[in-house]
Amino acid sequence: MAEHPNVSIVKSMYECFNRGDLDTIRNKLFAKELVWRLPGRHPLAGAKHGAEEVIAFFNELVKSNIKVDLVRIDAWGDDTVVEVHRGYGRVGDAVLDALNCTHYRIKDGKIAEVQVYMSDQYGADNFFSAIYEYAPIPARLAKKS
């Protein structure tokens, strides 16, 4: 059975990420209206809007030495891909190694919406909080105005 084209899109994103080819991800795989949601209480958590914000987020993941390996991936219907991946990395004493699930909505052959589900949210929060500092409170409050 041939691989579903939407599965190929998500696999391509992982391959490009792991070899550091963020330009291909931005220009060929991401929709302009992309929304990427990452849960948690750490500096990288929250919704990212548009390809540029997601690529900036990916750049931070690269700095954190995170690696991702697909474990399982399947397409459902014409616009949905769900996968399980292992996310792992180490920076100093901060270590992350967890299986996560991600839901993708594909529109017009591009990734348009992503929701990540963390199997070890506490571990992810600790890992990213150990690496990245929060902006000072006045700067965070100013963003909300």
Language model segments and positions:
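C-terminal and inter-domain tail/linker signature
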Residues: M1-S145
